[in-house]
Amino acid sequence: MLNIIINAYACSPNMGSEPGMAWNWCINLAKHCELHIITEGEFKEKIETALPTLPQGKNMHFYYNPVSDEIRKMCWNQGDWRFYKYYKQWQWKTYEMAKDIIAKQKIDIIHQLNMIGFREPGYLWKIENKPIVWGPIGGKI
């Protein structure tokens, strides 16, 4: 079974759009892989409630990298320039968390899942000796 780190800023079992997309990728990958999912903390309660109801829930390990309510509200408005500032900071902390996970777990692949704009690749690509998957990728030029 492959062990995968997934970076999914927005991930929720009860939503559509980015959070729902990430959740659906994760629940389907977890049928075949062991996942270590780093996500923001907004949907923690919903995630923790849903996991025990899924047969593949035992293959889904969540690590939360929460932001303040003020930053969270700002980040939902991605047109705000501050979104990019705080999202980059969040991505750097996620990179540090991923390195800690790799030090403790056998990880085969890294997946940069969302947010899915080509302008925000995160920092997980800096991790050496691990293949990285980035996408799906959206955005317009």
Predicted regions and their residues:
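N-terminal subdomain of nucleotide-sugar transferases
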Residues: M1-K58, A103-Q105, E128-P131
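Acceptor-binding helix/loop patch of EC 2.4 sugar-transfer enzymes
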Residues: Y9, D69-R82, K130-I141
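Short catalytic/ligand-binding loop motif for oxyanion handling, primarily in non-cytosolic enzymes
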Residues: N14-M15, K44-K46, I71-R72, G117-P121, ...
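Short linear interaction motif-like sites in intrinsically disordered regions of transcription factors
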Residues: N24-C26, N77, Q91, K126
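A conserved catalytic-core segment of Leloir-type glycosyltransferases
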Residues: H36-W92
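An aromatic- and histidine-rich active-site surface loop
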Residues: Y86-Y95, I109-I141
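Short, well-structured alpha-helical segments in soluble
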Residues: K93-Q105
